[in-house]
Design a protein with these regions (language model features):
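Domain-level signal for soluble alpha/beta catalytic cores
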Residues: 1-376
């Protein structure tokens, strides 16, 4: 096996990292108007530089900014699109035994993309990373699925086909903008595909006015329309998530309901799939993964708890997955980010880094890799 020189990498990670105490304190101070936006940004800059250096030091071939400038993994991007309004509601998103902050979005105008603060976030990352800078944004299907037809203005979009067309156009523009900014590794984070694997979530989708049975095909078309003009030198991956807030989850269920459309029909370069618990089901749905250049990133290491996995067990599961996908098409990562929201999961900072270090070590042992050394 050879070390991959293009994304995704044998040892990879989803993106978000636990927020350092300095950032949490600064955000609280900014909310109380005790410091300026510029002062907060300076603290974020400093902590992001530290996180980049730490990722490089443990041997990763990529670095993210940890999503340190975000409150939410998805809303912070969506609220920067034309036609999307962010607002406070009467309840948060319900996870297993806990709710998020009572904030959400609605579509009350025509969807569009014409610049975004996250372009500057990426430029800062690129300027300070000596390895491949990786940017993460939510997938277009996520904007639709979380609240469905009920959150999309009937006046603006009486026909949902027009909504999906505008959404795909907005993502094509976003992809071009990130590419122009120098991004060559972009990940679209997605909860829709995995939520559709849960019968309870499909029932909720129906209550919102959607037909869950038709959504896998609809989301495959939306994805491919968004990726239609993807530059040849840009790797775009997706991450499928069942919910990740304060170490809890929303959905359960194997990939059977969506595997053919997700793995067989969408034009991503790589797929990050959760496989850290029985809630994700078995590897059988991977039979739909095509042979060739695409990569499947096994999320076998949990980001929800601090206990370090047994390396031999992780290797055994990688070997089990090779019944369906060739080893040369597999990579390894945590199942999700460590902090999909600013609150973060319930584990220590050093436990997070120990997991990422272990992933690098396992990748070196399984694929026979040399430790990555960033260029000066």
């Amino acid at each position: 096996m050879t070390q991959r020189t293009s994304p995704p990498f044998r040892a990879d990670h989803v993106g978000s990292l636990l927020r350092p105490p300095a950032i949490k304190t600064a955000r609280e101070q900014r909310a109380r108007k005790e410091i300026t936006d510029a002062a907060l940004r300076a603290i974020e800059d400093r902590e992001i530089e530290k996180a980049i250096a730490r990722q490089e030091q443990i041997g990763l071939q990529l670095a993210t900014d940890g999503e340190f400038r975000r409150s939410w993994w998805h809303f912070d991007f969506f609220r920067g699109l034309a036609g999307v309004t962010f607002y406070t509601t009467d309840h948060g998103i319900q996870f297993h035994g806990v709710q998020t902050k009572a904030e959400t979005i609605k579509i009350d105008g025509k969807i569009g993309f014409s610049g975004h603060p996250m372009l500057d976030h990426f430029k800062f990352l690129k300027a300070h990373a000596r390895v491949t800078p990786k940017m993460t944004i939510p997938a277009p299907s996520t904007l639709h699925f979380r609240q469905g037809r009920a959150a999309i203005s009937q006046q603006i979009y009486p026909d949902l086909d027009a909504f999906f067309d505008d959404l795909a156009n907005a993502y094509r523009a976003a992809i071009r903008a990130f590419h122009d900014a120098g991004c060559r590794y972009l990940q679209l984070d997605d909860t829709a595909w995995s939520m559709l694997c849960d019968p309870n979530e499909r029932a909720q989708s129906k209550k919102r006015g959607d037909d869950p049975d038709s959504l896998p095909a609809r989301y495959a078309r939306l994805t491919n329309a968004a990726l239609q003009a993807k530059p040849a030198d840009m790797a775009i991956t997706m991450h499928s998530c069942r919910g990740n807030f304060r170490s809890t989850f929303i959905a359960s269920g194997g990939y059977d309901f969506v595997a053919e459309h997700l793995l067989g029909y969408t034009n991503f370069d790589g797929y990050f799939l959760e496989y850290d618990s029985d809630r994700a089901g078995g590897f059988e749905p991977l039979r739909f993964f095509p042979k060739g250049k695409k990569q499947l990133v096994l999320g076998l290491v949990t980001s929800k708890t601090g206990a370090l996995e047994n390396k031999d067990e992780i290797k055994r599961r990688i070997d089990e997955a090779t019944k369906y996908v060739a080893l040369d098409q597999l990579c390894l990562s945590p199942q999700c980010g460590f902090a999909s929201t600013e609150e973060g999961n319930i584990l220590a900072d050093e436990e997070q880094w120990a997991k990422l270090r272990m992933i690098v070590e396992i990748a070196q042992e399984v694929w026979g890799l040399r430790k990555s050394c960033p260029s000066p």
